[in-house]
Amino acid sequence: MLFLDEFPEFQPAALDSLRQPMESGDVTIVRANYRVTFPARFMLVGAMNPCRCGKAGDPGFSCRRGANERCAAEYQGRLSGPLLDRIDLHIEVPAVSAADLILPAPAEGSREVAARVARARDAQAKRYAALGMPGIRTNAQAHGPALEEVAKLDNAGLALIRDAADAMRLSARGYHRVLRVARTLADLDVAEKIGRVHLSEALSYRALADEARRAA
């Protein structure tokens, strides 16, 4: 797990250096006449404010740096499109108010969620083993033919992702990442096939990235 807080505050070159290991799961160091490749498979979690002052989108707030939209666009524009394209889940988390703190706990607690994730991972490992792919244990490791084998869509799903690909300008990488997330959501629901609801949710997690690219 690699957690980067205040994501856009890192140097753009440093952030973009993560692109290759995020894609391949390894990193190659070249020095003089030597070239060495190390394993570097990790899960990246980045957290950021919507803008430098952190108030963009708040009702009744006027940014001292100018228009709220401009402040947010400039700040979020520090993240390159190719980097954003490699992040599968883009989630907006609203500020927590004092009133939120006294609300009852969610119906599904952390322990229940962890158990559901463990069951999904176990199901994935068994699926790939049954397909003769023992080197793959999770959907995150599935690429190309392996992913296409386990993430087949019905006609309704194909129509949905075709329309979304045009509207959201999905890259080939983005398309495959949506399939991977949809397959995982189906596994969490103990569903044999990817349903429209799983595909729709997977696409929704890329909507914020699409907005950021348009703003930039």
Where are these regions (language model features)?
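Basic, amphipathic alpha-helical bundle interface domains used for macromolecular binding and assembly
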Residues: F7, A13-A215
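Walker B beta-strand of ABC/ABC-like P-loop ATPase nucleotide-binding domains
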Residues: L2-E6
